[in-house]
Amino acid sequence: MSLRNQLLGAFAYVLLLIIVALEVPLALNLARRIDAEVKNEAASQAFIVAANASGQMGNLAELRKLARSSGRTLGARVIVVGPPPNGRLLADSTVAAPPNTPYASRPEIARALQGFRVQGERHSDTLGQDLLYTAVPVTNNGKVVGVARVTQSLSAVHSRIRRGVLALV
């Protein structure tokens, strides 16, 4: 093998190492950014549902229509829960739970009923998949009158991250 071929091989190897060394941190950063973007988008969606539900908490027909239309638009499950202390289900974009099911004991609902935004990931044994949930308080004149929760599958989030990382490669 000639010296020229050895130098070209060494140059190609060093170039490959440089590309990999730059690509890995970039891919990790991109994955974190996409994850943060998806979570911020979910929070925005939950706040929009809460704002729309604010003046409708006494009108169950309108709340149910809001939950169904929001669920279709967002491709997520949307629920609206009534005021503390009971925190009963008022509207659901699916028919997963009957109306008046108590939700106040669920950690994310209990925290949102205290006025906090709650977001996290958990596994649903019922659905057999991992979920991203976002629960926000529904307020009216500064008082918490309920909770809006948006729940979406994490498989869609993970596939979006995967597509973004693969686009780099």
Predicted regions and their residues:
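Juxtamembrane membrane-water interface segments immediately C-terminal to a transmembrane helix
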Residues: L28-A53, M57, S155, G164-A167
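Glycine-rich acetyl-CoA-binding "A-motif" of GNAT/NAT acetyltransferases
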Residues: V144
